[in-house]
């Protein structure tokens, strides 16, 4: 498919989300986190990833969803950003899928606030919607601070 784009997909609550596969460094199970005092609520802590310090951003908190049920540990989608690696904490990892760019739709005008800032667009896939995250804004701790103020 010459006009397709690949996305790494994952679930956060009932939301089926994706981000550009070229930004994804790796996907991992739960890693130990160190809390960061005075950090925005979406920043769950710091992770030592083989000597590299990585900020962990909880997508449930970032998207205004309820906390994970007790005992449910998040998975890590480690992404490369211009400022270094960031881990997005998600509930479940999906697949790498390729979608036709012609099927891409911008978010509806009725989508407002933080969701509008983080969702780049939508694909309709076999009865479900794949929401594409703006990887730069989603992984930015500065955006997390601006959106809560």
Predicted regions and their residues:
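An acidic, low-aromatic, low-complexity terminal/linker signal
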Residues: 1-149
